[in-house]
Swiss-Prot record:
This is CinA-like protein. InterPro entries: CinA (IPR050101), CinA-like_C (IPR036653), CinA_C (IPR008136), CinA_KH (IPR041424), Competence-induced_CinA (IPR008135), MoaB/Mog-like_dom_sf (IPR036425), MoaB/Mog_dom (IPR001453). It comes from the Bacteria. PANTHER family: NICOTINAMIDE-NUCLEOTIDE AMIDOHYDROLASE PNCC (PTHR13939), NMN AMIDOHYDROLASE-LIKE PROTEIN YFAY (PTHR13939:SF0). It comes from Pelobacter propionicus (strain DSM 2379 / NBRC 103807 / OttBd1). Coiled coil: none annotated. HAMAP family: CinA_B.
Length: 417
């Protein structure tokens, strides 16, 4: 079945919000062996909505539309649909009853006048129940194309999609094939290098597709396998995933939706290790990432933001003479910070970062973007210099991710011994 999606709203085409609905729909369909072939986004304009429906209708068996079903003057979807399909707009009693019932649930007192725009539905349509919001959706058939219309509110749309739209399509798309997919999350390699390493995995007619998506500072590698049976798709995916993991090695830090902090945390918990942090240029970003993971209290002891030189000395025991002699941004100071936080916290691992995030403060010897990362463990202390050159925010993000990756890689190597 050829399925297209249409997102409606001025807020989308003006960049005020990101269209998450389209991604939600596409992912949900993939999970059921169906795919989106085209996607359009238009503003709150009746002519544009009508043109988009006509355009997609010529090449689609089904169109899933979100947005424009609200009560305000710029919600124009139902009017556009009525005009585009030659239907009349009428008060749908079922939609009206639902509207009043939901308004009462939301605390609107009896007797308060409620605009009934959301109960105006084109004739010859079937309602799509909305268990969590005021606006019912609806679907219809026009020129051989199923058309589904749902609110743009993501929480409402998602429920309606899974409870009504996908079951309807799945029942009618009898020719759909089994699709299985897997995301491999990669850090520490550029997109061209990842592409080079994965060359040859996808062969003509093998039933596999590969996609790379840069989501700074990581790269998501998506493997999608398609076959006549679930078992066939899973076998194709398994072989491809094994090959990709072997080629990318430890640069694959997780699969699916696990982030780098979660990957490091999983290893810390599994190995019974504890962690303490001393941060300068990142200002607590590493600790924020660590503590965003549920259960981090099982391994994270403390984090200290020692931004100034005095704080480095008082809190971490870094000698003032060392700072004066080598500079706050130096391998020697980074190592002293890592050892200091490990000793004061009594942790298994002590990680420290110090650097120049800019835009000022750089020198010829130590330009903006110079960062030192140090990891103190029972095995000793490892310190390295990095030069990240993408601006203040990106320097801090890259430092944070590199530090987390250091923790992850150390624990991987430790478990392999």
């Amino acid at each position: 079945m050829r399925i297209s999606t249409l997102s409606i709203g001025d807020e989308l085409i003006r960049g005020r919000i990101v269209d998450g609905n389209a991604a939600t729909i596409a992912a949900a369909l993939i999970g059921q062996g169906m795919r989106v072939q085209r996607h359009l986004t238009v503003g709150d304009s009746e002519p544009d909505i009508m043109d988009a429906l006509a355009d997609l209708g010529r090449t689609s068996d089904a169109i899933i539309v979100t947005g424009g079903l609200g009560p305000t003057v710029d919600d124009l979807t139902t009017h556009a649909v009525a005009r585009a399909t030659g239907r009349r707009l009428v008060v749908n009693e079922e939609a009206r009853e639902h509207l009043h019932r939901m308004m009462a649930r939301f605390g609107v007192p009896p007797g308060v006048q409620i605009g009934e725009k959301q109960a105006m539905i084109p004739t010859k349509t079937t309602l799509i129940p909305n268990p969590t919001g005021t606006a019912c959706g609806f679907h219809l058939m026009h020129n051989g194309c199923y058309q589904f219309f749902m609110p743009g509110v993501p929480s409402e749309m998602t429920v309606m999609l899974h409870e009504s739209v996908i079951p309807f399509l799945a029942e009618r798309d009898t020719k759909r094939r089994s699709i299985r997919s897997l995301d491999l999350n990669v850090f520490g390699l550029g997109e061209p290098r990842v592409d080079e390493l994965l060359a040859g995995i996808v062969l003509p007619g093998c039933g596999l597709q590969l996609g790379l998506c840069v989501s700074f500072p990581m790269i998501r590698v998506t493997l999608l396998a398609e076959a006549d049976s679930v078992q066939g798709a899973e076998e194709i995916l398994s072989r491809a995933a094994d090959a990709a993991r072997e080629r990318l090695g430890e640069h694959v830090f997780s699969e699916e939706n696990q982030n780098l902090a979660e990957a490091a945390g999983t290893l810390l918990l599994r190995q019974g290790m504890t962690l303490a942090l001393a941060e300068s240029c990142t200002g607590g970003m590493i600790a924020q990432q660590i503590t965003s993971v549920a259960g981090c209290s099982g391994y994270f002891l403390e984090g200290a933001v020692t931004y100034g030189n005095v704080a480095k000395s008082r809190r971490l025991g870094v000698a003032a003479e060392l700072i004066d002699g080598k500079g706050a941004v130096s391998s020697e100071v980074a190592e002293a910070m890592a050892k200091g936080i490990r000793a004061s916290a009594g942790s298994d691992l002590g990680l420290a970062v110090t650097g120049i995030a800019g835009p000022d403060g750089g020198t010829e010897e130590k330009p903006v973007g110079t960062v030192y990362i140090s990891l103190a463990t029972a095995d000793g202390c490892r310190t390295e210099r990095f030069l990240f050159g993408r601006g203040r925010d990106d320097i801090r993000i890259l430092t944070t991710w590199t530090a987390l990756d250091w923790i992850r890689r150390y624990l991987l190597q430790r478990s392999a011994v």
